[in-house]
Amino acid sequence: KIWDNCRDSLPYPYSEDDAQQFILFVSSQNEQNNYCIEVNQEAAGNISFARGIDVERYNAELGYWLAEPYWGKGIMTQMLALAISCYFHHTDVMRICANVYAGNIASMRVLEKIGFRKCGIHRNACFKNGVFTDCHYFELLKEEFRNLVK
């Protein structure tokens, strides 16, 4: 179920070697843009920010996933708010965007709970599991987030 809502670049099935490669990749980054979600001293998910380039260099795209046993417990809402606060504080990024596949209603609700607003729907924008699907586009500005957490 997790892979159904992630980009195809996330390996499936996810092996121990995939995990080691990811840790090496994250360790080599100049800017902290990946956050591990830990529950009961176990890795339970990930939050990542992919900074834009050129004229979009003050933007970042948000990606995240959480292991299924932890769904519906408010963990992702809490962890996203914390990671976004940290990322905005330590970078000059002014805007974070997120793309959510049409069927992932829970993920849309999580984003809205922490202040993201839906900007539109890109129709048939993604090809996942052999099917074209709409992608819901969300954004959050640094100044809006600051006003929410005051």
Regions found by a protein language model. Name each.
Residues 25-31, 116:
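Short loop/turn motifs at secondary-structure junctions and domain boundaries
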